[in-house]
Structure formats: C-alpha cells, structure tokens
Amino acid sequence: MIGKKRKRETNKEILSVYNEEVDTDNNIGRYKPLSVYIGAKYFVDATGNCDFSNNINCKFLEMKSEYQPMSLRFLMSGIDIEKFGKWLLEKDTDRNVTTVENIDGVTHLSTAYTWDTDKQWALAPFFDKAVKEGLIKDSDRNYFQVFTVAGMPTTLAFNCPRIPENLNPNLVKDTSKALIEGREAIYRLSLFCKKYFPGFENAYISNIADFLGVRVSNRLKGKYVYTIDDLKSGKKFEHPALISNYPVDVHNKSKNTSTLEQTGEYQLPIESLMSYDYDNLFVVGRGISADYMAQGALRVQASCFSMGEAVAKYIKNQLS
C-alpha cells in the first residue's frame, strides 16, 4: 500500500492510497492483490493492528513489555442455567465474583476463577482436581470467566481460554498457533464443565469465535502520547474524546502478575487518536497513542465506541 504525501510546514497529509504489493510476515512469498484506489480528505484506521498506518510507514510506540496474552472465546449451550446457578450460590458467597439473579423468570449469572492467589476462589478445588487427573492443563485455569447471554436461556459465554504463551498478534505464525492452542483448550474446558458443574450434563460447544481476542498489538504514535500518570491523576484536556473510569486491566501469562487496578474518572484527548505523521489520519481502537499500562484501561469496547464517535464528530466539524 502506497500513500501519497503532501508536504506542509508542520506536517503531512495523505492524498490517496492504493495497493501495490504485500509481504507476508513469514517471507514465504509475495502476492499482488486487486488494486484499489482510495481518495479521501480523512482516513480512520480501525484495523486493530494499525495495518493501514503500518503500510504507509507511520511511526509506532515502542513495545517495551511482552504482549498481553490473547484469548479465544466460545459458547456452550444445552445448559440448565437455573440448576447451575443454584449450585453456584451454595458454593460461592463472594458476590464480587459470583452473581445469580432471576429476572422475569430467567436466570442470569456470572462467575470467575483465575490461578492468581489474591482471592479465595470458590471454584479452585475443582480446577485443582481436574489438573491432577489430567483432564485439563495447568495453564487452562489461568483465567476462567462465564456469564449468561440475553435471549439465549440455555447458553453461557466463556471469556476464555487465555493463551498462555507470549505470542505476537502481528505475526501469522503466532496467531495460527494461538488459534490451535485455543481450540484445544476449549475442548478440555468443555469436558471439565460437563464433569464438575451441575447443569452441564447435556451441554455442548455451540460456537467458537471466528477471531482471536487481542488485547494489545501495534500502537500508533500520535500527536499526544497518553500515559498512565495522565490516567491516574485524572488529567483534564481541552478536547476529550471520551470520559471513563474503567480499571487498568493488564493480563499477563504468569501467575500473580496481572493488573486490575480501580481508577477514578479520566479523560482521553482527541490528540491521542491523531497520527503524528499525517494531519488527516486517525486511529481508533486498541492501537491508540497511549503507553502500555494506560492502553490496558482504554482497549475495551465502550471506550472504542466512544473513540469512533469522537473522531466522526471531529471530522464532521472540520468539513462543515
């Protein structure tokens, strides 16, 4: 992909882009896709990995830490949710971990477990036993979270497994490995649930996500690099793209090294969505201009929605 630049005294603008040729990340070969010419006054990179920005040679923030582990989510159906919910209430009294509510005759629930030792996890004995008997791997229990899905009364969504290796989400060979390992772990977790959880007797895997859940990959260098100090201090900005209080949520592949830190209210400036290299290029999603820890609070769906809205409003104002 080639970007045509227009020089300015302070910065540059993209005039148009077109596909020329693509390198595969494993250097096996090259191929030429169908050429597409795109001309626009503004460009928004919402690719997640900042693929558009990378292909026109934008600057990126340095990755000083390991990538957060990727996840592969799935659904199980055919579950007696009411039976499982009653059992959970008997086993777990921590309502910060397990909640079970009956709303209009339908049971809604959520529960979790991790291999971290910061809590007395009610589900820990079941995972310990399953590891000892070889039903699941030790790494399969690094992160386990389930919750009901509105309109699907016999289904639970699993926010796991979390792939335990340090893999690069920008490399095809690594994402392929993550998908393989994730699907194998899903099979093991499904057997575990059917054996140890009441209500799962007739349960089955009904869906596996088409894509990996990637928490962090490339981060564009923007006109402002948002920091964890900005976030923790609640620094105010003239042009906030969003306001949030979602915690700093940074996953790690090792035990007792993940971060889930509550925060006060904080703002993200629109300048952290603006490319340093091009005046008319924006990025939304996990690839924003923020340091590693701050990005861990801003990568979630609600914040990404707000980024898109903020950029759209900004561009609309520039065009009017």
For each of these PLM feature ranges, what is it?
Residues 18-21, 31-42, 47-320:
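Flavin (FAD/FMN)-binding glycine-rich loop and adjacent Rossmann-like elements that form
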Residues 3-37:
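Conserved beta-strand-loop-beta-strand element in the redox core of flavoprotein oxidoreductases
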